[in-house]
Regions:
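Flexible nucleotide-interacting loop at or near the entrance of a catalytic core
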Residues: 108-147
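N-terminal accessory targeting/assembly segments
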Residues: 1-99
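Short alpha-helix plus adjacent loop in nuclease-associated cores
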Residues: 95-114
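Short amphipathic alpha-helical patches
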Residues: 46, 57, 81, 103-106, ...
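Alpha-helix boundary/interfacial micro-motifs
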Residues: 44, 81, 86-88, 104, ...
């Protein structure tokens, strides 16, 4: 599978060497890399322009996955996914490492432990995605109820 790597650092130079090796170990073909040096944006993790640049690179290279070498919050992941083209999958470093563990788990117990870790990690992301997707459906001002 083709993947684009992206990394944001607060200051200094972004080094993607280890991250590149992790992506290759998970079976991804790296077709592009983008780095950004700046403070974290609360909405998109990267700046809005950089997310657009990632989307253009994904479209140009026909990548199926964008992998971010940072811990990305559930709302940030959702916002990035909305900007990327089509059904582009967005992964962060933690998910990538879980993917590698899942591919290499030999025993049933190890496979179940990896699956449990994945589900625990995905729960707040699924909740955030549902909340954001249903935000416009809440009728009225200050309506009670949570998704």
């Amino acid at each position: 599978m083709k993947a684009v790597l992206a990394k944001r650092v607060h200051s200094g130079r972004a080094d993607l060497t280890e991250f590149r090796e992790l992506a290759a170990a998970a079976g991804y073909e790296i077709v592009g890399e983008i780095t950004q040096t700046r403070a974290e944006d609360t909405a998109h993790h990267f700046g809005q322009g950089k997310v657009t640049e990632i989307a253009e690179l994904v479209a140009r290279t026909d990548a199926e996955t964008a992998i971010i070498d940072n811990e990305v919050g559930p709302y940030q992941m959702f916002n990035i996914g909305r900007i990327l083209p089509g059904e582009t999958e967005v992964l962060d470093r933690f998910t990538l490492i879980l993917t590698i563990f899942g591919q290499r788990a030999q025993t049933r117990k190890a496979q179940l432990q990896v699956e449990l870790a994945e589900l625990r990690y995905q729960l707040p992301r699924a909740s955030a995605k549902t909340s954001l997707a249903k935000r416009d459906e809440r009728p009225g001002f200050m309506v009670l109820g949570d998704y």
